[in-house]
Amino acid sequence: MTKQAEETQKPIIFAPETYQYDKFTLNEKQLTDDPIDLFTKWFNEAKEDPRETLPEAITFSSAELPSGRVSSRILLFKELDHRGFTIYSNWGTSRKAHDIATNPNAAIVFFWKDLQRQVRVEGITEHVNRETSERYFKTRPRGSKIGAWASRQSDVIKNREELDELTQKNTERFKDAEDIPCPDYWGGLRIVPLEIEFWQGRPSRLHDRFVYRRKTENDPWKVVRLAP
């Protein structure tokens, strides 16, 4: 069968357009001078919505150079300040660590289904200082701290038993430790935004979209409306 013929075959999965976005609108009067302020408002509204069970979930996308291959994964956003959005992870062995080491550009997306809203952020990444990483690490459950030591994230392992054995070894290693230290390869990464888009779903896919842009962190924000 030719490639063209394959493309005309019935798809394995077909998702017809049935869902309508019809709850809210977004217009110029609702915008703020600083997009961080509008994001904070939207995020707090998502937190207060009982149907948004994990408002801090994000899609984090990075790209390795020189290949340009993009990788994405779901992570949990942890901190926000006026410089940017911070996540925490293994920066020694993970796929995203390799990507960021070759290309500091990254993007994150928040999607709140019940509120029919999406926020897309593009920017430059930077590692937070050690003090900040250790401060956050102390708030993690003990099991998660041990897990950070046990797992060389994204390395190939033989089976689940290997991971369980490493976890047990580190559980024994730190059994007398009141405070488990933060590994030197583990810490925070801040995405300093250069572009933040606010998307509000509207009927017939005629969504409201506004994007804030700046060339560098020190430049003022400019905002424009985009066609849906």
UniProtKB/Swiss-Prot annotation:
<keyword id="KW-0288">FMN</keyword>
<comment type="function">
    <text>Catalyzes the oxidation of either pyridoxine 5'-phosphate (PNP) or pyridoxamine 5'-phosphate (PMP) into pyridoxal 5'-phosphate (PLP).</text>
</comment>
<keyword id="KW-0664">Pyridoxine biosynthesis</keyword>
<dbReference type="GO" id="GO:0008615">
    <property type="term" value="P:pyridoxine biosynthetic process"/>
</dbReference>
<keyword id="KW-0285">Flavoprotein</keyword>
<comment type="pathway">
    <text>Cofactor metabolism; pyridoxal 5'-phosphate salvage; pyridoxal 5'-phosphate from pyridoxine 5'-phosphate: step 1/1.</text>
</comment>
<dbReference type="InterPro" id="IPR019576">
    <property type="entry name" value="Pyridoxamine_oxidase_dimer_C"/>
</dbReference>
<feature type="binding site">
    <location>
        <position position="209"/>
    </location>
    <ligand>
        <name>FMN</name>
    </ligand>
</feature>
<feature type="binding site">
    <location>
        <begin position="153"/>
        <end position="154"/>
    </location>
    <ligand>
        <name>FMN</name>
    </ligand>
</feature>
<keyword id="KW-0560">Oxidoreductase</keyword>
<dbReference type="GO" id="GO:0005758">
    <property type="term" value="C:mitochondrial intermembrane space"/>
</dbReference>
<feature type="binding site">
    <location>
        <position position="118"/>
    </location>
    <ligand>
        <name>FMN</name>
    </ligand>
</feature>
<keyword id="KW-1017">Isopeptide bond</keyword>
<feature type="cross-link" description="Glycyl lysine isopeptide (Lys-Gly) (interchain with G-Cter in ubiquitin)">
    <location>
        <position position="29"/>
    </location>
</feature>
<dbReference type="InterPro" id="IPR011576">
    <property type="entry name" value="Pyridox_Oxase_N"/>
</dbReference>
<feature type="binding site">
    <location>
        <position position="140"/>
    </location>
    <ligand>
        <name>pyridoxal 5'-phosphate</name>
    </ligand>
</feature>
<feature type="binding site">
    <location>
        <position position="136"/>
    </location>
    <ligand>
        <name>pyridoxal 5'-phosphate</name>
    </ligand>
</feature>
<feature type="binding site">
    <location>
        <begin position="73"/>
        <end position="76"/>
    </location>
    <ligand>
        <name>FMN</name>
    </ligand>
</feature>
<keyword id="KW-0832">Ubl conjugation</keyword>
<feature type="binding site">
    <location>
        <begin position="95"/>
        <end position="96"/>
    </location>
    <ligand>
        <name>FMN</name>
    </ligand>
</feature>
<dbReference type="GO" id="GO:0009443">
    <property type="term" value="P:pyridoxal 5'-phosphate salvage"/>
</dbReference>
<feature type="binding site">
    <location>
        <begin position="205"/>
        <end position="207"/>
    </location>
    <ligand>
        <name>pyridoxal 5'-phosphate</name>
    </ligand>
</feature>
<keyword id="KW-0496">Mitochondrion</keyword>
<feature type="binding site">
    <location>
        <position position="199"/>
    </location>
    <ligand>
        <name>FMN</name>
    </ligand>
</feature>
<dbReference type="GO" id="GO:0010181">
    <property type="term" value="F:FMN binding"/>
</dbReference>
<dbReference type="InterPro" id="IPR019740">
    <property type="entry name" value="Pyridox_Oxase_CS"/>
</dbReference>
<dbReference type="GO" id="GO:0004733">
    <property type="term" value="F:pyridoxamine phosphate oxidase activity"/>
</dbReference>
<protein>
    <recommendedName>
        <fullName>Pyridoxamine 5'-phosphate oxidase</fullName>
        <ecNumber>1.4.3.5</ecNumber>
    </recommendedName>
</protein>
<comment type="pathway">
    <text>Cofactor metabolism; pyridoxal 5'-phosphate salvage; pyridoxal 5'-phosphate from pyridoxamine 5'-phosphate: step 1/1.</text>
</comment>
<feature type="binding site">
    <location>
        <begin position="20"/>
        <end position="23"/>
    </location>
    <ligand>
        <name>pyridoxal 5'-phosphate</name>
    </ligand>
</feature>
<dbReference type="InterPro" id="IPR000659">
    <property type="entry name" value="Pyridox_Oxase"/>
</dbReference>
<dbReference type="Pfam" id="PF10590">
    <property type="entry name" value="PNP_phzG_C"/>
</dbReference>
<feature type="binding site">
    <location>
        <begin position="88"/>
        <end position="89"/>
    </location>
    <ligand>
        <name>FMN</name>
    </ligand>
</feature>
<feature type="binding site">
    <location>
        <position position="78"/>
    </location>
    <ligand>
        <name>pyridoxal 5'-phosphate</name>
    </ligand>
</feature>
<dbReference type="Pfam" id="PF01243">
    <property type="entry name" value="PNPOx_N"/>
</dbReference>
<comment type="subunit">
    <text>Homodimer.</text>
</comment>
<dbReference type="InterPro" id="IPR012349">
    <property type="entry name" value="Split_barrel_FMN-bd"/>
</dbReference>
<feature type="binding site">
    <location>
        <position position="144"/>
    </location>
    <ligand>
        <name>pyridoxal 5'-phosphate</name>
    </ligand>
</feature>
<comment type="similarity">
    <text>Belongs to the pyridoxamine 5'-phosphate oxidase family.</text>
</comment>
